[in-house]
């Protein structure tokens, strides 16, 4: 889990737009962020396996 101070820091609007970065809405992780879902790959995978993300299916080919 991300430190609470880093999560709070990311929520604040930065002085310059390029300093802004995305964090997972669930756990606060900054890496492996999926913009379409607003969460990191780990949270995405857990919720997808539980069936809590509508329209997401496991690939099979």
From Swiss-Prot:
GO molecular function, a single term: structural constituent of ribosome
One Pfam family of this chain: Ribosomal_S14
Cofactor note: Binds 1 zinc ion per subunit.
Binding positions for Zn(2+) per the UniProt entry: 24, 27, 40, 43
Cofactor dependence: Zn(2+)
Family classification: Belongs to the universal ribosomal protein uS14 family. Zinc-binding uS14 subfamily.
Job description of the protein: Binds 16S rRNA, required for the assembly of 30S particles and may also be responsible for determining the conformation of the 16S rRNA at the A site.
Protein name: Small ribosomal subunit protein uS14
Organism: Natranaerobius thermophilus (strain ATCC BAA-1301 / DSM 18059 / JW/NM-WN-LF)
Originating gene: rpsZ
């Amino acid at each position: 889990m991300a430190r609470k101070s880093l999560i709070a820091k990311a929520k604040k609007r930065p002085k310059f737009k390029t300093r802004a970065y995305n964090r997972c809405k669930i756990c606060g992780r900054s890496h492996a962020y999926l913009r379409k879902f607003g969460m990191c790959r780990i949270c995405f995978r857990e919720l997808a396996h539980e069936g809590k993300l509508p329209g997401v299916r496991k690939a099979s080919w």
